[in-house]
Amino acid sequence: MVKVGVNGFGRIGRLVTRAAFNSGKVDIVAINDPFIDLNYMVYMFKYDSTHGKFKVDIVAINDPFIDLNYMVYMFKYDSTHGKFKGTVKAENGKLVINGHAITIFQERDPSKIKWGDAGAEYVVESTGVFTTMEKAGAHLKGGAKRVIISAPSRDAPMFVMGVNHEKYDKSLKIVSNASCTTNCLAPLAKVIHDNFGIVEGLMTTVHAITATQKTVDGPSAKLWRDGAGAAQNIIPASTGAAKAVGKVIPELNGKLTGMAFRVPTANVSVVDLTCRLEKPAKYDDIKRVVKQACDGPLKGMLGYTEHQVVSSDFNGDSHSSTFDAGAGIALNDHFVKLVSWYDNEFGYSNRVVDLMVHMASKE
């Protein structure tokens, strides 16, 4: 079982840790976070307001901003995912989850984290800060063998499970798991393109609030309206998720682009893919091929539903993407709007774990 370190114990760092314990596929041995103490880590891991109390191997965590007690708190309690249903505590300077002790670091400089001493072979870079090959590569200096960036990267190879993961080569030391939205869009786009051909398309993601947004109106380093209060507004925003599909499906490069609407919900987002098809297809034909993919090569990653679902129905869902057969529409046999849901936190975190497992299988 591959031994994993987590850098940054924020939303994705904690949920990757949860996903790791739930799946039993990887061993978390260390965590780094300079802003959270150990007891707070325990709390934050165990209680999650969205996903509930923790139910799950991780060997090290780094977060320079959280002391150990705070780590305990943040892991235990989560406003989105609910209280952690296992045991989590701080003991002898370590974070102990279900009896499994995890080494804690609080380094701001990733090159100073002694991942090797903790036994961490793979590092999940989940701070959102060290997203380039050069910056993420600092983890290798501390003894890590490979780094998985849990965000899009300007220059690291990007992989989406079920889409292009088979192209991973063990010579690669640093990779990106792309974004949650790319992980939702790419499997659906692949199925549609493989069966009917996508001439061109526009994507819109209606996206839940994330930690980068403001609780009340404040200054934004990007677009001014990005600084509007997240709970008060629907905010048009940019996203590179659709263009990134062209990196994982080269045949679609230059054929897709998109935007986002940030909406005041805590979790779960939805993709609207409006595209022109090369081959004619009835909407029932599209439903059929998507369902076949869900039951076949994309099982566990792409889901399918004909129920009258809403966003909260997907809270805690581990799929990358769930096609909503009843929500899509067709103007004609060549022009369609397709809808797919995703838990932008938990579904994505499960794919981070799956990517590490796949990489380890190539060692």
Swiss-Prot record:
* Residues binding NAD(+), per UniProt: R11, I12, D33, R108, S150, N344
What is an annotated GO biological process for this record, any one?
glucose metabolic process
> In the record, what terms sit under GO molecular function?
glyceraldehyde-3-phosphate dehydrogenase (NAD+) (phosphorylating) activity; microtubule binding; NAD binding; NADP binding; peptidyl-cysteine S-nitrosylase activity
| Protein origin, superkingdom | Eukaryota
Which residues are annotated as modified residue N6,N6-dimethyllysine in the UniProt record?
Answer: K3, K94, K222, K243, K255, K291, K362
Which parts of the sequence are annotated with region: Interaction with WARS?
1-176
Residues with the modification Phosphotyrosine, per the entry, are: Y70
So what does this one do? Has both glyceraldehyde-3-phosphate dehydrogenase and nitrosylase activities, thereby playing a role in glycolysis and nuclear functions, respectively. Glyceraldehyde-3-phosphate dehydrogenase is a key enzyme in glycolysis that catalyzes the first step of the pathway by converting D-glyceraldehyde 3-phosphate (G3P) into 3-phospho-D-glyceroyl phosphate. Modulates the organization and assembly of the cytoskeleton. Facilitates the CHP1-dependent microtubule and membrane associations through its ability to stimulate the binding of CHP1 to microtubules.
Full protein name: Glyceraldehyde-3-phosphate dehydrogenase, muscle
